[in-house]
Amino acid sequence: MKKIFAIVLTTILALVTLVGCSGGGNSITVAVPNDATNEARALLLLQEKGYITLKEGAGITATVRDIAENPKNIQFREVEAAQVPNVLQDVDYAVINSNYAISAKLNPVQDSLAMENSSSFYSNILAVKAGNENTDAVKALKAALESQKVADFITEKYQGSIISVVQNPGNGFDDSVNYDALAGTTISVAASPTPHAEILAVAKEILAEKNITLDIKEFTDYVQPNNLVESGEIDA
């Protein structure tokens, strides 16, 4: 699989707690995502806020085993990222990806105690199988996602919980693409329901102007879409 460009948005990690959770005992419990990248992001956020210190050199592959100092005696509960909001009632705090927080009816901006900086480089990308990155279908999808219409939707819909990272949004179309040849075709793309499928729905409207159908397939995990792209079952 090949990364094409860091498009569209950054899903921010937020540290949240349930109202009424005191964490007043000898230790507190924090739920964190258990996949490699998001667990490291959670730990780096906690380090940035002064709750823990990681071993020297621990970065995007950090796990709880890389914690060097834990002065608040935090106990960590490692949970599949999509399930972190569901265990919030059982822990004192949780570090949640903003897309999953939004799906759980949480507001990452208003409800969080801390958030990743808006300049976080963990941007979501459009990924296709190596060799397909310069096809007209992929370029058409890329142009639609990098449009001003999509950027405006992200700003208005998510109010800072999700951030567009497109530097110069366009009109949604790529002059190098033969849209007449693409008319009547279908582009398939896998995405999580919130916010990715919602954002893709805006791109779908843009592509429909050229009689191109965008088939959005929703998944709740990160792994299966990657496998489907690699196998060629979906386009992106």
Where are these regions (language model features)?
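Short beta-strand->loop
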Residues: 63, 77, 105-119
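Alpha-to-beta junction loops
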Residues: 28, 51, 72-75, 89-96, ...
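Short helix-initiation/N-cap motifs at beta->coil->alpha
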Residues: 58-86, 216-227
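Short, well-ordered beta-strand elements
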Residues: 26-31, 182-194, 212-218
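Short, polar/charged alpha-helical segment
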Residues: 44-51, 57-65, 193-215, 224
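Periplasmic-binding protein-like
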Residues: 40-43, 47, 137, 145-166
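A bilobed periplasmic-binding-protein/Venus flytrap-type ligand-binding module shared by bacterial periplasmic
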Residues: 122-140
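C-terminal motif of bacterial Sec signal peptides marking the signal peptidase cleavage site
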Residues: 16-20
